[in-house]
Amino acid sequence: MMQFKEYFKTPIYVEDLPQWVDPINKVCDPYIKEAKERNKEKIKKQKGSDFGVVAHSFPIASDPKLKKYIKYIGDRSWEFLDCMGYDLKNHTCVFTECWVQEFPKDGGGHHNSHVHPNNHVSGFFYLHRNEDSPLPVLHDPRPAALICALPEKSGKDVTYASQAIHWRPNPGTLIIQPAYITHQYSVGGPNKPFRFIHFNIQAIEKRFMRSQ
């Protein structure tokens, strides 16, 4: 009898925290407003349309109003790496990047496939999303598997042969994933605001950390 044993699996951490949405949106509203102000000239050149113009904030991880949320995400990220089997007793997790962004109401918002180099964890927390919003897409991180991939029986099913997957998060969904996974966002059409926080975390050796 044939038995399947799974090795080299890729974990994705998912948690629903809808109680975070309203308080975090309240903190993030001014950041998005400021980002849209910076985009005014681009929108003006497009005759008032924000098609393809993403409102992208400056770093927000140090905002005191977000402290408890940032700490929670940092703790879960450490636990995520620990559960993967990494020895982190001499490491601490540090946010290298954290920002909020909102895709344009007129559509065209997207992210091409990419990774964030020199990080160990990437993640998202969704603040506004409806059924027509862009979809987050993750790609198979195994280059050798992609090089010799055979045709899939069905692109509709998630199988061992899948080269990419997507999901439909809700406002309040927290995603934590290994930073080596290539990810993207599909092109969105005209829709209600699609807003999320994107963050990247590096596990740094404690001996390199500045003592307080």
Please report, for each region that a protein language model flagged, where it lies by residue.
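Active-site region of the double-stranded beta-helix
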Residues: 64-97, 104-120, 127-131, 135
